[in-house]
Amino acid sequence: WIRLAHWLVMVSFPILFFTLVTGYAQIFSPDWALPLIGHFPPWEWLVEFIALASTIAIIGLIVVRSVNTAHGRKSRFTGSTRWQARFVEATIVAVVGCVDLLRVAESAWLSAAQHEQSASWVHFPIFGWLGRPLGQGANPDTLANVIAVLALVKILCSMTWFVIVGLQPSMGVAWHRFLAFITIYARKHDDGTSALGPLEPMIVDGKPLTVDLLDELEESDAEPNFGVSRIEQFHWKALADFSACTECGRCQDLCPAWNTGKPLSPKLFTLALRDHHAAVAPFIAAAQQLGVEPEEVSDEQLAQRPVHLGVRDGLSVNTSLGLAENSAHTQDILGALLEAKAAPSETGVATKPAPLVGEVIGEAALWACTTCGACVDQCPVDIEHIDRVIDLRRNQVLMESAFPKELGQMFRKLESKGNPWGLPPRKRLEWAKGLEFDVPVVGVDVEDASEVDYLFWVGCAGAYEDRAKKTTRAVAELLHIAGVSFAVLGDGESCTGDPARRAGNEILFQTLAAQNVETLNEVGAKRIVV
């Protein structure tokens, strides 16, 4: 029912906007209506249904948020800006409430003015049952004034909302009403599924990185940039994603890193980048050039401020995670994400262009992501969190050589042994020992893959990891029982490069992927079981 309630509130925005247009005229003339459709019964029925349904829906959503807004990691609203959500909810309640009351008042006014036919259920199917009795014997002039006042209140609430939202470019809970259409339309898949899918290619000099492009770059004297180190290097879809975040916390609720106490929340990761982007946006810089300078905050003043999320639920995340008491970025960005070095502002946002990793997003948070994709799968506005994490990792690995030492060991093992554990290739067939049938190997038992129905790609885990070996054996047995001929590459198989790509080493991934493509072409593989 929550999805239905949210859908009703969403639909109320474009439909009830026309009642806002009507309200401007109703201040002066209570019987004014939109040309052509204003007194068209189906339109009036739609307005009344949407107004009443969205009123019930928003009240229900407020109750859900209030119940789920617990303190600590258990709440998906931890870190969300509470006052912004309450402001948006209050505005919706006020506007749709005014529409409800206006329909009652209009029905009462028509009844008082002896326009019984216009006040009938044909035009007021829901609110007329309350309005018509109220209009009996009432003064039409008084009811006309009531209509004017309600219309004015509706206009003031709506315009106040537009002004405040316009002044708060980082108010995602409001801006998603405009940007969600863009982020959903521009997602990776056009078949209606979520944005979860293959990682975006790394763009270098306007081209997707490939082995051929790497060869060109080696011959060139230019120094290309890999990945993203500053906010302006993100493409427009990424920036739209940041501003479209609704702060609903569904990504945070299912994040394994967050739920196991790691210093990462996909929601707060997005909000950190959003707030930094808003703080260093070109229009802010233009205002500074005109003499509008942000407030200067000294280290002493900053140290005297309470360390918590400020307006975001009052939770001291730094304290709860055992971090330093006086971290610079604590109000708009989760303190656990940050080891602040850039110039902080009163709100805790880095207000000057700065490297993102270490100054907007903490290194521990960046490497805590498992790239499982639960955040992307759950996001209602199709924000692509994983791609943004990998963008930052690519820069750290390929430009800064800044990554956990365990990854360095894995990279070397992938390069030398073709698997993340550094095990010898000759052990890739150990999973087949003990089977009641022989597993043919391409180049040994069969000349090439064209002699069998399928090439069975075992993979590193399926070949080396004890639990995965059971799955590999089961698949092979099923193929054998079904009478499907298959073969494997044995020690000719190498890692797909997926671990390297998830870790940000796109160059190593492209190298391994190209090797595998070459191998598959050589053996003539047409149909592959993975």
Give residue spans per PLM region.
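Iron-sulfur-cluster electron-transfer modules
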Residues: 1-60, 67, 233-242, 264-268, ...
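Short, basic interhelical loop/turn and adjoining N-cap
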Residues: 259-263
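Generic recognition of flexible, low-complexity loop/linker segments
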Residues: 105, 144-154, 164-167, 234, ...
